[in-house]
């Protein structure tokens, strides 16, 4: 009898399927991490923009990035601008998310280089759809 364990159930290898997630709200960080891990991704979490910045300086190997727009120390758009200025990080697609209702935040995020924008609160299905748009291929 051959049984498949969790490590081999996804079509793609989990190696190379890493996403950095930064949000200063611990509940949102846990929620997004849980959803992405169920999709087969390895998640590297950061509690704020400064922590995400430090991670990105030493580790450029991410499939995608998901950042809150408004965070202490370094904002989401500031992180995206940093990524777009670094050759080794330029190709990582970025999703921005926020609970703020100010339309300027989404336009600032896109101007910085974000690919998709997800308003909070969101459903699991909405996050999955935006992730597929972000990465540009189906996760089936």
Predicted features by range, described:
Residues 40-47, 55:
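Short hydrophobic/Thr-rich beta-strand motif most characteristic of the beta2 strand and flanking loop
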Residues 122-131:
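C-terminal output helix
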Residues 60-67:
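Active-site beta3 strand of CheY-like receiver
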